[in-house]
Curated annotation (Swiss-Prot):
NCBIfam families: PRK05409.1 (NF003818). It comes from Photorhabdus laumondii subsp. laumondii (strain DSM 15139 / CIP 105565 / TT01) (Photorhabdus luminescens subsp. laumondii). Belongs to the UPF0276 family. It comes from the Bacteria. This is UPF0276 protein plu0081. Disulfide bonds: none annotated.
Length: 307
């Protein structure tokens, strides 16, 4: 059975937002095998865990054994990295069905993917590559998202990318492109605040202004991560989305401004390289939780002052 989802206009009222916010408005962390033992033994007070779908596409093994137990105690988010939603080629149906089976097995609160491409013909590239923002690309991305949502029988969240180059062929901005994808497909937005900051700095744009141009009423989850500073060929500052360090001060500041606009949203700390001890991730999550709690107070104060 497949479910037909809207291909054009979607409602922007409160029920849409509630449907996308199925994770608790708390901070979570990525579930790493290095931490399985500590999590199973200590059961830390954390809002949710997130996994990369492609790490769990086999039928069994120790990853599934640990996840099955952990899933009993925590909400789960599944994050895809290999569907190549922005690719020129048709979606790999075998891969899509394996992802759908994983979603059916664990019933995560949300499923998300990237606005990027990573395959071309039979070639798989171990990266998330940018795409031109054109009408042709827009149509293709929307068709791919419709296919994924039908296969998974649910709306997905689409993550804004971190980019290092732009295409002269683009006819619209990244924020306009994302807004139109959300409008046409009914998907939600996984707002990666780190990516937003990186792309703004790399392309000499104001990250805060970019934030205001996004469909914030459709945010179902937020990502935070660390970046690395580098230099391009012209010796200009280039930020790299490395996911291997603490969240930086400017990203925390942009995150705080985000929550003042959206209200409390489930927030993930991403740390995918140079994995630290679990306590380090829990401390980062605690910092995010502080901002979430403050945003709840701000929302309550705002409502009270307008009553």
């Amino acid at each position: 059975m497949t479910v037909s989802l809207p291909s054009h206009s979607v409602s922007r009222d409160a029920p849409d937002r509630l449907m996308l916010n199925r994770l608790p408005a708390r901070a979570g962390i990525g579930l790493k095998p290095e931490h399985f033992r500590a999590i199973l033994h200590n059961k830390p007070d954390i809002g949710f865990f997130e996994i990369h779908a492609e790490n769990y596409l086999v039928a069994g093994g120790p990853f599934h054994q640990a996840l099955t137990t952990i899933r009993q105690d925590y909400p789960l988010s599944i994050h895809g990295v290999g569907l190549s939603i922005g690719g020129e080629n048709p979606l790999n149906q075998t891969h899509l069905q394996r992802v759908a089976a994983l979603v059916e097995r664990y019933q995560p609160a949300v499923f998300s993917e990237h606005l990027a491409w990573s395959t071309h013909n039979d070639l798989f590239l171990n990266d998330l590559l940018p795409l031109p923002y054109t009408d042709v690309t827009l149509t293709r991305v929307c068709e791919h998202i419709d296919q994924v949502q039908n296969a998974l029988r649910r709306p997905i969240l689409l993550e804004n990318p971190s980019t290092y180059i732009e295409f002269s062929a683009s006819t619209m901005s990244e924020t306009d492109f994302i807004s139109e994808v959300v409008r046409r497909t009914g998907c939600g937005l996984l707002l990666d605040v780190n990516n937003l900051y990186i792309s703004g700095v790399n392309h000499n744009r104001c990250p805060r202004q970019m934030l205001l141009e996004l469909p914030l009423h459709r945010v179902g989850e937020i990502h935070l991560a660390g970046y690395t500073e580098s230099r391009d060929g012209a010796n200009d500052l280039l930020l790299i989305d490395s996911h291997d360090s603490h969240v930086t001060g400017p990203v925390w500041d942009l995150y705080n401004k985000t929550l003042r606009k959206t209200g409390p949203i489930a927030t993930l700390i991403e740390w995918d390289s140079n994995i630290p001890p679990l306590d380090v991730l829990l401390n980062e999550a605690s910092h995010a939780q502080h901002y979430i709690t403050e945003s709840k107070k701000h929302a309550t104060t705002t409502v009270s002052s307008t009553s």
